Amino acid sequence: MAQESADLASDCQSWLQKLSAWEQASSEETQKDTCLHLSGFQEFLRQMYEILKEMDSDAILERFPTIGQLLAKACWNPLILAYDESQKIVIWCLCCLMNKEPRTSAESGLNSWIRGLLSHVLSAFRFDMKEVCLFTKSLGYESIDYYPSLLKNMVLSLVSELRESHLNGLSTQSRMAPERMMSLSEVCVPLVTLPDMEPLVEALLTYHGHEPQEVLAPEFFEAVNEAFLSEKIVLPTSSVVSLWFRHLPSLEKATLHLFEKLFSSKIICLRRMECCIRESFLPQAACQPAIFRIVDEMFRFVLLETDGAPEVLAALQVFTSCLVEALKKENKQLTFALRTYFPYGAPCLAAALSQHPEAIPQGHRLQPLLHISQLLREAVEDCTRGSPRNPFESWFLFVHFGGWVDLAVAELLLREEAEPPAGLLWLLVFYYSPQDGSQQREQSMVELKVLINRLLMLLRSGPLSATDLQEAAESPSGDPRPPVCGQLVRRLLLSLLLWTPEGHAIVWEAVTHGPTFEITGPGCCPRIWRSTRPQHRPRAHLCCTEMAHTDAVIHEIIGFLDQTLYRSQHLCVEASRKLARDLLKELQAQV
């Protein structure tokens, strides 16, 4: 104990010198030095309080004669008091110095001096602590009398000055100097989480000067962004947009923060994704094309790095849907042309894809689908003839709007015509195997057409069984044609089971209990865009095993069922949604 007290006495002298140096100067370097050493000073105060609370006032002053000076300097340093922990410990330490039963005028004078320090601290900053009531009542006042009038008035004054400076525009005499703006933003770094500072933080974020360089400190942007992402402060949309527009690292960190939330679960849940995306403010901010382009590029990078993982595709599509909704809410007439958001795709294609496919009446869906297929095909074939556009760009634009794929599958399986439209076949083959050349894509379309004809023939020929589905999806032995993408085959079979009365009868057997299908083969793999594609793809096949026994496949089915529920309002009847919900619960219980 004695050794610890001696060490703290030495530390007290060192910190007193440091506080005196901070007090004598208000330069940028001093502010940075204060912020740098705040955590160490907090730890010192914490250790000091543990000693002081066991001692009486006389013993404290005898052991630590300069403790009063140190605490007084701390009380007048706004950077120290900006932290809740520092505020609380300073008050506790001051309370320890109070003489409970003053017997001399010197002791009464000390108590009066300490009351003055406490009064300053409590009037300058807002506290929501039980200790405040105790301290203020001991001074003979109610806590309401110490509401933060001083800080509030200072903030309001600065906000008014910023607004006046902003309105004066190019008037250099009335405009706040860039150096002062920088200094003010640096001072605010440790204060951004204080509720009374919110108006000043918002005013700084939305202030736009006429200087060629940024006038606010990057540390200010980082502190505000960190506080916003950790939900310690609430900002209006305009302030958030300004923050991310002016400070690219903050936008990147916010996007990565969203990715961590979206991809933390192995199970895809689109409604949870939508909730996270809306709460992130990124769709609203992405109404600014510059912000959207950064977020979109980060999605592109993750999509490539994960080989087109289903959860990344799903997140991209939900984000795009939220963006389109935000654009319509912001202005019925788009402020920016769609080509500004998707500069690498054909403008007419972006306009066609941005429509809501679910809103199209059931009898009028084929023509928009065929139009999109034609536009995509022209763009892709134009790429092969030497156009500067990359085929990947057309595919990347297409996958933003996944609802059209659902619509294409529904049109193929639920139409009464004998021959499936070639445009829909091309659309699905391109979505699931974008890396294929035109000749290989034509072969896959033939294979897909054969599969769909077999499935539709089964529906017309009588009661359906899981074995029938199994046989219909198998390619004839020795067939040299390349198989249709396994992911696409599974999607067709599951859609057939959910969207037709014949499928309802066997869906439980096919998916959870009875013989079902495990299809191997390439899925949607964007990495092939930048690597060598294998010359021979494995044959898609069906085997009599339970689909639920393969983790990758069961997760794919869960994702498909969740997607069906998410987008099924105009695509499925109520019975299909009920089946999807029940199957989803059953499969989720197995993982």
Swiss-Prot record:
Its main location: nucleus. InterPro entries: FANCC. Pfam families: Fanconi_C. Ubiquitous. Keywords: Cytoplasm, DNA damage, DNA repair, Nucleus. GO terms for cellular component: cytoplasm; Fanconi anaemia nuclear complex. One of its GO terms (biological process) is interstrand cross-link repair. Coiled coil: none annotated. It is found in: Nucleus; Cytoplasm. Signal peptide: none annotated. DNA repair protein that may operate in a postreplication repair or a cell cycle checkpoint function. May be implicated in interstrand DNA cross-link repair and in the maintenance of normal chromosome stability. Upon IFNG induction, may facilitate STAT1 activation by recruiting STAT1 to IFNGR1. PANTHER family: FANCONI ANEMIA GROUP C PROTEIN, FANCONI ANEMIA GROUP C PROTEIN FANCC. Belongs to the multisubunit FA complex composed of FANCA, FANCB, FANCC, FANCE, FANCF, FANCG, FANCL/PHF9 and FANCM. This complex may also include HSP70. Interacts with ZBTB32. Upon IFNG induction, interacts with STAT1. Interacts with CDK1. Interacts with EIF2AK2. This is Fanconi anemia group C protein homolog. It comes from Mus musculus. The gene is Fancc.
